[in-house]
Structures are given as structure tokens and as C-alpha cells.
Amino acid sequence: MSLPTLPEATDAGTSEPPKTQSRAPRIRSWAAGVYGQAAANALLLGVLINSGNRGLLSGLPGGYSAGTGDHYVLSSMGLHWADPTRYAGDWFLEAAPQPHWFFDTLTYLGSSLGILDLVYVLFWCFGLAAFGLAVAFLSRKWAPSMPWMFGAATTVLASLSPWMVVGTGSSMLALAIPAVVSANLVFLFIAAALTGRSRWMLAAAVLTAVVHVQQGAVVAVLLAALIVVHVVRHRVLPKATSAALAATAAIVAAGLTARPVAANTGDFVDICNELIAYHCAAQLWGTSTVLYSLATIGLALFTVMYEPSGNRPVWGAVVGLPMIGLSLGLMANVLSVPFFGELAQGLNVYRLGALVMPFAIMGLLLPLFRLGNKHLLAVLPLLLFTWEYLLSDSWAPVIPASAAFAAAYLAVVLIPVVVRSRRPERAVMTTRLSASALILLFLGTAVGTGSLTFRSLNTTYIPNAEVREWGEAVEKAVPPGESLLAPPLASYIRAATYRGVIADCKNIPYGGVPWAEWQERLGDLGGRDQCLDRNPQAYNGQSSEQLDRIAEKYDIRYMVVEQGQSDRIPELRELGWSTVLEPVNTIQNVVLHKTG
């Protein structure tokens, strides 16, 4: 397929342009084509995510960050490979290694070469590029008269959307982690399948399996569905797709064999119900969360209206199948259907939520770019889904529910429907103006709520300088191989010091013996309920004698006493503990050591 090109500049009277200028039209052609649009989408998305403040709601910095959040769990193994003194003897690292071998390798390479900050931000940018390319592919098929406007609207709305989608983290999370990058790769896989770009589709499939084993398994199922569609329609087995399926399945099988995601399905269901209900226990969700999830899926299913009838079987294989599977699993879980409800949890059907968001956004844009008087029956259910997904406070605090915003939104998206029905010759111009107004409405609202703060990109691993400085001091004071007695809620301690801990509320095994051991360890440290209610008193309320006995049980010789607990230091000294590190900065933590 040839890409659309810009008109060449009018000859200014010279007989032949110099050869040094011959590349200019090609560069302009590339910039105006699908790959130029993809780059623009990716850049816009990166700027908006880095300017976003959703992270502040969950204890993360604003914008992109590294060495925070899920990096507390996912970076440890690669850092240990690069420097065996880091996390040496850490119980969690030895008992429950994470399944992300590729991310471990990236971390190892980045840390070994002293460029971990750069490696992580490039990994994040790789995900942005995948998203940008997917949007560019689809915009040229679904909105061929104005692909750039469709792409910009999709990108802006996606960047402001909620970070939790049907129980799983969105691809808009401002972190360089496998879940984020793989979600964007799956989006690219689906977009390439829908637009007939087979090479990109097959490459995205294999890359997804490399980056994230669970999402690789999802892509393997979608590849199998595409093969079935192809065989039914053409009576021949697609060799390239079959080879990609074999490669993807092999990578997934190898990854799961080397590092099983969940050692015991029953244990994983218990973990869902007791510790991470927001992620995979829909029977415990509130009604509003369930309705929001169903509306998200419903909007994604509406994207079938963009597809010509001849390509809808392909859409059914890569969009319809996972969306229907997710909705069935969700409802089986919500209704606690015997066997099937727990099966949905055990298989972690909620991983499919990562596929939903970009298609839900494009479903929102249907009235703006496609619907007319032939589709009036579809407008009402679409608006009902839109109301639940967008206008019922689900996007708060970025986009708060308000009558003014709802009225402005409905006017912007419905005016093109009316014009397209009555004055089709003005439809393109009206759509352009309305799409521009929609983008300004969302950006203006986000700025007005303080949800966008334009900032420079901070790629530093552990961006908080004081936490980083304190962690470096502890790393020097506590010998390699030693672990720390520390509050379970203070997950930053393990991450910043590169020393193991007895257990914390962030590093939780997915089942088996490690899960039982984690429960015992948390029980000794004040109980696992503190991980749910975020109550530090469960640990801090224990006596100095109790803490001393815990240290003895787990052969721990170093203890972190956080600010606010310094009154217990004299008692601990009487029990044989001595200070090895005084407060370093405003983080008024003290590190104690016990000999013998």
C-alpha cells in the first residue's frame, strides 16, 4: 500500500532542483503519512501523560516516574543480577520471583551500564510509539477524511482517562512497566489486524509475548481466532499467522514454565478476595464500579460500526471476542456463579481490561465522526454508555461530573450528527470544528481542575532526592546479605536501600508456599489487615520487646525506626540495639543494629 503524499512544491522556474533537495518531498511525505502521524500521536500522548497528576492520587509523583510504584516489585531481580550485593538474601526475591524475565533483563542491562534511567524511559517511549502507531492505523481507516483529527481526539481523551479499567491498570499509567507497554502492543496488534497490516500484526504479537507473558497468552488466543476466520473465509491456512501463533505460544509456555504466574489458582482467588479486590474480585465492587466497567466494554463493542461488513469477522476475532469474554467473566464473578465466577478470577480474565480503553474512547467518538440519521437507533444506547462511562463522575477529579460539562459535551458530539443527517456537504467542516472543540473542552477542564501541570521529564530512578540519599546511606551502613526489620507499609524502604525486608504490603506472592509464608510474616508484623486499611498503628503499636523477638525469629540484625517512633529507641538500646545511622535529612529514620 502506498502512503499519501503532500503535493510537491511548485517549481520556482529552475530547470531541475539540485539533488540535495530531492529528499525534501520524501521527508514531507513521511511526516504527513501514517508514520508521521504515529510519531505525532506518541509525542502528544507522552507530553500529556507526563503532565498528568493522576499519580498524585495514588502516592506516585506527578507525571512519568521511575523507581516508584510497581518498580518496587518489578525492578529488584534485574538490579540484583547487575549487583549481587543488592537484595542479597531477600526473602521475597528468592521465594516469589516475578514472571517478567524480559523486564529483568532490561533492568540488568540498564543498571550494569549505568543507564537505567535511560533504558526505562526508552521502554516507556516504546509503548507510546505502539499506541501512536495503532491510532494512526485505525484513524486512516475509520476516519479517512480527517485521520489527524481523529487521532488527536483519541490521544487526548485516552491520556485523561481513568487509570483503572475493568479491574486492571490502564496503558496510560505513567510508569515503564511490562503491563503498560504490553497493553499498547496488544492495541497495536489489534489495530494492525483490523487494517490488514500483517507484518506489524505478527511483530506486535511476538513482542507482546516477550514483554508480558499473560498478555502474550491473550494474543495467542486472538491469533488462533484470526486463523479460524481466515480458514473459514479462504479455505487455506495462513502460514505467517500460524508461525506467529507457534512462536507466541512457545514464548508464553517457556515463560510460564520458568516462572509460573500463580502457583495455586485457589490461593490466587483468596488473594483477590482478601487483598486486591479492586483488581480481580468484582463481586466485592460497588454498583457504580460494575456499571462503569460494563459501559466501558459496551462502548468498545460499538466500534463495530466503524467497520465495513466484510471485515466484521476480523473485528469479531480481535475486539468482539475478548470484550465478550471479559463481560461474561465479569458478570460470572459479580453474580458469584458457581465454578465460573472463581474460574474468571483464577484465569485473571481482568487482564483483558487492558484492551478495552482505547476502543472505548473510539466508541465515544462515534457520534462525532460517523453517526448520522441512519444510525439514530444506536445513538440512545451509545449515549447511555457514555453517560455511565464519562459523565457520571467516573473520570473525576480530572473530568468532574457537572451539568455544564455534560451539556457542552453533548452539544459538541451531537451537532455533527444533525449536520451529517441534514447538510452532508458541511459534515467534514462541522466535524473538524466539533472535534477541535471537544479536544479544547477536555484539556481546558483538566487544566481547570489542576489535573494537568506541564513539567519537564524527570527520568531519575527514585525521583525523590531525599529518599534516594537516605537509601544510599543505608546501603553503605547495612552489609550485603543483611535484611531489615521495617514497617510493612513503608515499601519505599526495601526499594531505596536495596536491602531485603521480612515482608511488606507491596511484594505479595501469588500463591503456594510463599503465600503462606507471607501471611505468617505479616501476622508477626501486625497482621495483613494493615495492608488494606493502611493503618500504621498495627505495626507501630507493638512493643519494643515484640519487635526484638520478631527480629530474633527471622535472624534480623538491622532495624529501621521511622520518624515518630524514635521514643522507643532507648528501650531498644536496653535490649542490645545500637544506632548505626542517624537521620540523614528530613527523612528522620534511624537504623539500629544488634550484635550477638
Locate the predicted segments by residue.
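Start-transfer (signal-anchor) and selected internal transmembrane alpha helices
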Residues: 1-55, 413-440
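Membrane-interface junctions at the ends of membrane-embedded or membrane-associated helices
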Residues: 18-31, 193-200, 228-240, 361-380, ...
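Active-site lumenal/periplasmic loops and adjacent helix-entry segments of GT-C-fold
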Residues: 35-159, 163-184, 210-215
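Transmembrane catalytic cores of multi-pass membrane glycosyltransferases
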Residues: 50-71, 82-100, 210-221, 225-365, ...
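Aromatic-anchored segments of alpha-helical transmembrane domains
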Residues: 155-163, 209-214, 249-259, 322-334, ...
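Transmembrane alpha-helical segments
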Residues: 158-163, 382-420, 431-461
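Membrane-interface transmembrane helices that cradle and orient dolichyl/undecaprenyl
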Residues: 180-200
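Short periplasmic/luminal acceptor-recognition loop of GT-C membrane glycosyltransferases, typified by
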Residues: 449-454, 459-537, 544-568
